[in-house]
Amino acid sequence: MTELPIDENTPRILIVEDEPKLGQLLIDYLRAASYAPTLISHGDQVLPYVRQTPPDLILLDLMLPGTDGLTLCREIRRFSDIPIVMVTAKIEEIDRLLGLEIGADDYICKPYSPREVVARVKTILRRCKPQRELQQQDAESPLIIDEGRFQASWRGKMLDLTPAEFRLLKTLSHEPGKVFSREQLLNHLYDDYRVVTDRTIDSHIKNLRRKLESLDAEQSFIRAVYGVGYRWEADACRIV
């Protein structure tokens, strides 16, 4: 295995390739493009490495000594959504791989241009970055909303909410910073045509805020925007 010292903010690319010259060529091009490549030449070394040091993207050759690329891709997908680019020597093999739906993000056929590989890497990382940031933000959210059970918790502590309070909490916390008018909140709260007043929302918000602050007095949760409505001040919720 060939691994080079990297800056922690540099995207890490795992190259799984058993041809030394081709592997070194990819290392050179990826380093020149400001990536941090690591080369593994034997299939049996891949899973332990990925579990211990997850890369940002994997270039995975199909034919390898030890565990083959097809099996590795399937196994990695069992525990990770790391972008995977499969590399094959046969263009007709790509159709078969697509049909198997193994979970790869892209496919490259040998012989290829190293510049093409770098371009694919850039495109895939750019595409995956917003999604991964959202997932990371979700995983760190202190507010968990369980739609199926109609339950919500803040930092592991359950909130005792009415159905109306639950809907308001979900609506506001799903879009932090967005100001919702009372009319918008009423529309989210009631899907029928019952006659209610703006004061109904104010009453529900008051009760919801009180319950939240009883769990965390230091956190600002819901702020009133004079003449407009309300906005969520804390982190976005995680909906499960």
Curated annotation (Swiss-Prot):
Entry keyword set: Cytoplasm, DNA-binding, Phosphoprotein, Transcription, Transcription regulation, Two-component regulatory system
Q: Where is the Response regulatory domain?
A: 12-125
State the encoding gene.
Answer: baeR
Q: Which SMART domains has this protein been placed in?
A: REC (SM00448), Trans_reg_C (SM00862)
Q: What is the protein name for this chain?
A: Transcriptional regulatory protein BaeR
Recorded hits in PANTHER family, A to Z, give:
REGULATOR OF RPOS (PTHR48111), TRANSCRIPTIONAL REGULATORY PROTEIN BAER (PTHR48111:SF59)
Q: Which InterPro entries match?
A: CheY-like_superfamily, OmpR/PhoB-type_DNA-bd, Sig_transdc_resp-reg_C-effctor, Sig_transdc_resp-reg_receiver, WalR-like, WH-like_DNA-bd_sf
Where is this chain primarily localised? cytoplasm
Q: Determine the domain of life of the protein's source.
A: Bacteria
- Name the GO terms of the biological process aspect: regulation of DNA-templated transcription
Mind telling me which GO cellular component terms the entry cites? Answer: cytosol; protein-DNA complex
PTM summary: Phosphorylated by BaeS.
What PROSITE patterns has UniProt attached to this entry? OMPR_PHOB (PS51755), RESPONSE_REGULATORY (PS50110)
**Localization, UniProt:** Cytoplasm
Keyword match Phosphoprotein: yes
Any one Gene Ontology molecular-function term assigned to this protein's record: transcription cis-regulatory region binding
What Pfam families does the entry give? Answer: Response_reg (PF00072), Trans_reg_C (PF00486)
Record-listed 4-aspartylphosphate modification sites: D61
Annotated DNA-binding ranges come to 131-234
Keyword flag Transport: no
